[in-house]
């Protein structure tokens, strides 16, 4: 019974309130921080649980009043409303009770790379960057370009953007994979549609506790920054290239104004890539039944097609097709895709958890 599953959460919430008011604990900053975070995470479940349990009590109370000559009709009407409310609250609670992705509240590194298609792929990376930035602005997320390499005719060969905001990972984690674009290039005189592809990786920003790197495993090179076309744009050796020797992962950063800033940014990206690698290995070891049905976020998985002649955007994981490509890209309206993906994932997770 759902009500029984809620009791441990209510009990723990009361325990946390008691602990947080304890003078001895209030002097321990790290303990206070951990308990406050746990309390905050429980609040949505507890609030909804209290509303649900009150609804159950109200239903029973109104059932007793049905035979009352004066209050019977009023109780009947109230009971009707409560019976409609009950299943809605149950569905909301089931979703709240799903195991939480520990990365959901984290900031992300959004990495986009041009794949097949040459200049057209680079141009589309530029278009997608603008769309993601608009999406970030729509949700009041902060963002900064960590590193970039411009395409020869515009756009980017590759770019990494740090997006900061509560729930950034939870909203954008489904973007990882191969995105295919179909459109007529401006240089195409015959009007033929060209197909190109880009890859997107979503990596949660991690701290030193989550990923520890042995300094002896790193090869750090400094060099002069190069701009569009490869020309030097800096007379000092401010660009930094970090190679993680055990994995062969290489991170280059030259967008910052100082060597220190570039090294700091490159280390953050390296940690995120190593964390992503660990997550992919972990997912690969899990049984198929536990994997998300919407995909693993693997860069090689083709997840979406953008067809400009048809103004169509299709997400292949959930067979979603929208004929609003221009509006979605220009307005950064990715929630029109994100929301159905989240709903699908939650439905699959509910089946797996037997809720």
Curated annotation (Swiss-Prot):
It is found in: Cytoplasm. Methylated by PrmC. Methylation increases the termination efficiency of RF1. Keywords: Cytoplasm, Methylation, Protein biosynthesis. Gene3D superfamilies: 3.30.160.20, 3.30.70.1660, 6.10.140.1950. It comes from the Bacteria. One of its GO terms (molecular function) is translation release factor activity, codon specific. The modification N5-methylglutamine is found at residue 231. GO terms for cellular component: cytoplasm. Belongs to the prokaryotic/mitochondrial release factor family. NCBIfam families: prfA (TIGR00019), PRK00591.1 (NF001859). HAMAP family: Rel_fac_1. Peptide chain release factor 1 directs the termination of translation in response to the peptide chain termination codons UAG and UAA. This is Peptide chain release factor 1. It comes from Campylobacter lari (strain RM2100 / D67 / ATCC BAA-1060).
